[in-house]
């Protein structure tokens, strides 16, 4: 037991940052910003401020999207940063949305619903672990795709009913059966082999550059001017993209 503790200590020492330059710190600072906004979302959930929860998660997802890109741009990727990012993602996109939905449903004492909530958190952890283990194993044709729904997208899907209720005042969605099945669907989709668009190395054809810029501009404007409406639109666009991702992925796989 003592030897195991020594080995873990040595491993932690090896993973410590070798330098503290601005180049190294910036991506990790962005990751910590994502974690801060995720924790702020949790704080807002405790008081039932569901719109604020969604806005905090949106901001956290922006920082989460930037940290990896900045690290690659500055050539400052590290194992330390990868682990920090995974831990942050687990909290922000795994634990926080699960807690928010549980509180939104008025803390039901139903054991089955609690099991469903726990299932989502567990699948989030499994999804992140699988992603880290597959970083160097993906074939070239699959670089534009994720295996399963990523945790940030899963968090958006989890909070989708909260946004619908707040925007449309549709309380019929607040049903154990509907929300339970929705959470199970999201959980399974995270650990499935469903191909989903990555966007990390996605190249837009020249003929589609202007239409894509227009769509991005409209989405950005919608999110800024009306975050909840923009959030709903973004989630609907993502849901619509899922079958297209599978079609394009299978075509590339056949050609490979």
Predicted regions and their residues:
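Active-site His/Glu-centered metal-binding helix of metallohydrolases
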Residues: 36, 62, 66, 70, ...
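Multi-pass membrane catalytic core of lipid/isoprenoid biosynthesis enzymes
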Residues: 26-32, 73-131, 160-163
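C-terminal ends of transmembrane helices
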Residues: 69-78, 125-141, 191-199, 245-250
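Topogenic membrane-insertion module of multi-pass membrane proteins
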Residues: 1-65, 233, 245
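Helix-coil boundary and interhelical linker segments in multi-pass alpha-helical membrane proteins
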Residues: 40-56, 91, 95-117, 160-178, ...
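Short, amphipathic, aromatic/basic-enriched membrane-interface segments that mark the entry/exit
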Residues: 20-28, 80-88, 145-147, 197-208
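C-terminal membrane-associated helical module and adjoining short loops/tails
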Residues: 1-15, 143-256
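Alpha-helical transmembrane segments of polytopic integral membrane proteins
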Residues: 39-42, 59, 97, 122-125, ...
